[in-house]
Amino acid sequence: MVEITEVIEPEWQTRNDIQNLVNQKTLQWVFVGGKGGVGKTTISSSIATALAETRESVLLLSTDPAHSLSDAFGQKFTHEPRLVNGFTNLYAMELNTSQIIDGLDGLRETHSFLKNVPDILMMLPGIDEALSFVELMQSVQSRRFSVTIFDTAPTGHTLKFLKLPDVLEKILDSLLKLENTMGGLLQLFSSMTKAQMSQNELFDKIKLLGDMINTTHEQMKNPDLTTFICVCIPEFLSVYETERLIQDLAKSEIDCSYIIVNQVLKHIQLGGLIEDAWDGLTEEQQRIMTPFFEKVREHHSTHNSRVDVQRKYLSDIKDLYQEDFNIVAVHQNKQEVRGKDALVAFAKKLMQHSPLPI
């Protein structure tokens, strides 16, 4: 009698596509980041078009000061969500965090979240940036999009951006610990501002603000709600920054399970085609065509040398991440990816099985 053993598939398996990402209906925040020039905007825009196929409403938001969303879609975007041409449920906006910081005072007069920020807190160094992040997340969430994709700034700015809730949470925790010992002093400082308040009222506001920030922070650390996609190219600096980014995301407890390796080159195999073509020419033709054939050989050699360099870093990426990450390889496009049709086509590539070519 043959014994039948039940085969149990593991709950989570790595893939070489973004199928699971697109099908994960619980996701609310998708951050796309990496070194400058690796194609983050193309990737984030393409993912947004794919999510628009499965989600009720999608917001694509650029926080990179050097905005490129308008170029990617061939449509002007501003700091307010605007419907992307050709879609009924995909919106895009370009926003600098500095714009939020500059407008904090005005927003505090009208926004329920910022009304709870005591004047004394605005004196703390770095508080404006931290509040701008929480204000951004609260504002986006209030618009009730099913999912928001962030096209982020280069790595260094992104890491600072993502650490802001943690920074603000620690500041408020420190203030709350001073409630008994320095409450009177804080109240004295508070009395010097526009809005005077009692010690209890001051700390009640700090606690309420802390609860709001804690909620945002917990959402950021919940892999069912938030994930980060690293985009890189197979070059030293990009791979180095990707490792740095992954390490920092791990320290911040932010889920990162996708790495998209962009601009991967293919080997050009000419074999004996050049020699056969050369041998088929007369001496006169060879004399005329010599410069052309030399250029072909030079470009062929240069291209394949670049491919060999890329293969080294592709191998490093595979060794470092293949067991724990969904790694998607995207070959170098012949043309710029611009406009709805090109972005949708690019998204289809990301949805297909695309392992590293090594």
Swiss-Prot record:
Keywords: ATP-binding, Cytoplasm, Endoplasmic reticulum, Hydrolase, Nucleotide-binding, Transport. InterPro entries: Anion-transp_ATPase-like_dom, ATPase_ArsA/GET3, ATPase_ArsA/GET3_euk, P-loop_NTPase. It is found in: Cytoplasm; Endoplasmic reticulum. The keyword Hydrolase applies. Its EC number is 3.6.-.-. The active site is at D64. GO terms for molecular function: ATP binding; ATP hydrolysis activity. SUPFAM superfamilies: P-loop containing nucleoside triphosphate hydrolases (SSF52540). GO terms for cellular component: GET complex. Homodimer. This is ATPase ASNA1 homolog. It comes from Babesia bovis. The lineage of its organism: Eukaryota, Sar, Alveolata, Apicomplexa, Aconoidasida.
